[in-house]
């Protein structure tokens, strides 16, 4: 627990202190966010707000994770693990794709950055590298950072994927989560606040897995997860970085995370869900993100097949703005929904453990 608190503290400090420096730098460079002309009228006043704040979030995550391990040398903490590095690497790789996208938008003063093909190739490449590496690096107990078995709270033994199918599965998971968080990042503080809660839930889940790991505590209900404590540090650092960034990103936002932040954060959820064996449970924890990307898919499919729209605008947080909800009302209600789904997800996780031990 001490390591988790250190990770949160370092990440919050780095993010909250670095963000205003980025605001000044990007403002001086003229790196202002471009607003869609067909968006809600209330958003036009945000034109010119600095973007690429995701740099501060990634810096906070890196500092929180590696800073905690450096501090751990003083009290014999666990070392850096393959699982932690793979999740961090996935997030950083996706953040790099987002950074290029943001940079093109800002340099060309338009709302379109990388073309869809280039962006998709970047996401797929990141996912494939992660998928291939995450089944390697077995520890002395024979555990790899991930399993080829589909997982809810632990592996579902009846659903085992071939290596090729596992790679395809990871591509779908990474693409879905990175785009889901990207679509959600359309209102001040919405994505950062929701991410802080989802990763906070993952801190609880992975910390519990660490205390009930089959390697150290074999018995009913134990978890075959490699490096759960290190995954908890990644989750804690992410939550802390989002909280620090939210100080400046809350309405009215002084800076936006941009694709640099949203794609990286989506990678965090994808990476944590695969390495903690909770791919299906993640859908409950991040249900708001799932709803956002689903609204976009429904809007596109319905319009192409019927010529009609389900929502006034997608992602559907904009729909609520256009029907009269104030932006802050949408944000707070979506935060509340995320808190509920995170609570439900943690309850399902703990309930499964109780059932496993026969309680």
Curated annotation (Swiss-Prot):
- What membrane topology does this protein have? Multi-pass membrane protein
Q: Which GO terms describe its cellular component?
A: plasma membrane
Its transmembrane ranges are 3-23, 55-75, 80-100, 117-137, 156-176, 187-207, 231-251, 255-275, 280-300, 334-354
- A single MF term (Gene Ontology): phospho-N-acetylmuramoyl-pentapeptide-transferase activity
For this UniProt record, the keywords arranged alphabetically read as follows: Cell cycle, Cell division, Cell inner membrane, Cell membrane, Cell shape, Cell wall biogenesis/degradation, Magnesium, Membrane, Metal-binding, Peptidoglycan synthesis, Transferase, Transmembrane, Transmembrane helix
Question: What processes does the entry annotate via GO biological process terms?
Answer: cell division; cell wall organization; peptidoglycan biosynthetic process; regulation of cell shape
What Pfam families does the database record attribute to this sequence?
A: Glycos_transf_4, MraY_sig1
Substrates-to-products reaction catalysed: UDP-N-acetyl-alpha-D-muramoyl-L-alanyl-gamma-D-glutamyl-meso-2,6-diaminopimeloyl-D-alanyl-D-alanine + di-trans,octa-cis-undecaprenyl phosphate = di-trans,octa-cis-undecaprenyl diphospho-N-acetyl-alpha-D-muramoyl-L-alanyl-D-glutamyl-meso-2,6-diaminopimeloyl-D-alanyl-D-alanine + UMP
This entry's Enzyme Commission designation comes to 2.7.8.13
Q: In which pathway does it act?
A: Cell wall biogenesis; peptidoglycan biosynthesis
User: Where does the UniProt entry say this protein principally localizes?
Assistant: membrane
Instruction: Relate the protein's function as given in its record.
Output: Catalyzes the initial step of the lipid cycle reactions in the biosynthesis of the cell wall peptidoglycan: transfers peptidoglycan precursor phospho-MurNAc-pentapeptide from UDP-MurNAc-pentapeptide onto the lipid carrier undecaprenyl phosphate, yielding undecaprenyl-pyrophosphoryl-MurNAc-pentapeptide, known as lipid I.
The protein here is known as Phospho-N-acetylmuramoyl-pentapeptide-transferase
Q: Which organism is it from?
A: Mycobacterium marinum (strain ATCC BAA-535 / M)
